[in-house]
Curated annotation (Swiss-Prot):
Top EC group: transferase
Identification of the protein by name: Nicotinate-nucleotide--dimethylbenzimidazole phosphoribosyltransferase
Pathway connected to this protein: Nucleoside biosynthesis; alpha-ribazole biosynthesis; alpha-ribazole from 5,6-dimethylbenzimidazole: step 1/2
Organism from which the protein derives: Dehalococcoides mccartyi (strain CBDB1)
Family: Belongs to the CobT family.
Name of the encoding gene: cobT
Reactions catalysed: 5,6-dimethylbenzimidazole + nicotinate beta-D-ribonucleotide = alpha-ribazole 5'-phosphate + nicotinate + H(+)
């Protein structure tokens, strides 16, 4: 807990003075005040995070964390667990959707194995921080120990701290793990208080019969483990996943370093919910990249008071939505840096 506690102690609110200056600059640009809508709000929030009315967005990374899940033993999933490590290898060598979208926005990919079940060969492009070969089947007991849950969070903090040392203005979260919509639905239901019917989606394409099995399995896991909704680490340890804990650590670590976090879809959202329950202040550092088609994603975003930048009917994960949203965030910041003011352009201002 030492690293986690030290990280939490470094998190404080937005720089209001920088935000006022950023908004004042927006108000003198050659446009009606407020006419760029959410683009203006984005850059003002960025200013508050970085403490600079002209924030930076050049140095970007997407951290994609992977873990397997014991609940796939319940036989309602369409894909074998081996796919997790196979996709990790694709991430590491540039062939996946997240690689394409990261290249497009100029973000580096950071690929982390945190709880992968299938043995894998050493790869210089994969950071192997495996805590265990996947979670235990939460239908029969806790997914992991409390100590392992804390370790997952602290690995996430360590990973983002290392990226900050390389230079980091924006960090996106991404995930990979067969079966990880189940723990995400469990986390969402427990913390928001919404029913499993409300928050559970089809994941990678579950049939109606698979959906019944999925909801029943998650309900059994929650009933058996009885997690404390107010104790995020208890929730994570009993019904979570290693990659979810790691991404929660990325979010907390980024906030401690005054780095904006672009949160991807449902699994990243579950990680954000864990981080938010530990430290509500982290909301100030998060941008919700998009609203996934997973129904629980909208619910957890509403719980945290976050508005999604995009709505693209996506449900892939990996950090793909985060990479896309970085384009919007960078565009907002370019307006702040490059657009002319009324005085610069010789344009008459609105008459009072």
């Amino acid at each position: 807990m030492e690293l986690l506690n030290a990280t939490l102690a470094k998190i404080y609110g937005l720089d209001k003075e920088a935000m006022v200056k950023a908004q004042a600059h927006q108000d003198i640009l050659i446009k009606p005040q407020g006419s760029l809508g959410k683009l203006e709000a984005i850059v003002v929030q960025l200013a508050g995070i970085q403490g600079d009315a002209k924030p930076k967005t050049a140095k970007k990374a997407i951290i994609t964390m992977a873990g397997d899940h014991g609940i796939i033993d319940e036989k309602f999933h369409n894909w074998p667990k081996e796919v997790t490590v196979q996709m990790l290898q694709n991430f590491a060598h540039g062939g996946a959707a997240i690689n394409v979208l990261s290249r497009q926005v100029g973000a580096r990919n950071v690929v982390v194995a945190l709880g992968v079940a299938t043995p894998m060969a050493a790869d210089p492009n994969i950071i192997n921080r495996n805590i265990a070969p996947g979670t235990n089947n939460m239908v029969h007991g806790p997914a992991m120990t409390r100590e392992q849950a804390v370790k997952a969070i602290e690995v996430g903090i360590e990973i983002v701290n290392a990226e900050v040392k390389k230079g980091l203005d924006l960090v996106g979260t991404g995930d990979m793990g067969i079966g990880n919509t189940s723990p995400s639905a469990a986390i969402c239901s427990i913390i928001t208080g919404r029913s499993l019917e409300d928050v559970t989606g089809r994941g990678t394409g579950a049939s109606d019969e698979q959906m019944k099995l999925k909801r029943n399995a998650i309900a059994k896991a929650i009933s058996l483990n009885n997690p404390d909704a107010k104790d995020a680490i208890d929730v994570l340890s009993k019904v979570g996943g290693y990659e979810i804990g790691g991404l929660a650590g990325v979010i907390l670590g980024a906030a401690a370093n005054r780095v904006a976090v672009v949160v991807d879809g449902f699994i990243s959202g579950a990680a954000a919910l864990i981080a938010y329950t530990i430290c509500p202040q982290v909301k100030d550092f998060m941008f919700a990249a998009h609203q996934s088609v997973e129904p629980g994603h909208r619910i957890l975003l509403e719980h945290m008071g976050l508005d999604a930048i995009l709505k693209m009917d996506m449900r892939l994960g990996e950090g793909t939505g985060a990479a896309l949203a970085m384009n919007i965030i960078e565009a907002a910041n370019r307006i702040q840096h490059e657009m002319a003011s009324f005085a610069d352009a010789g344009v008459s201002e609105k008459q009072s």
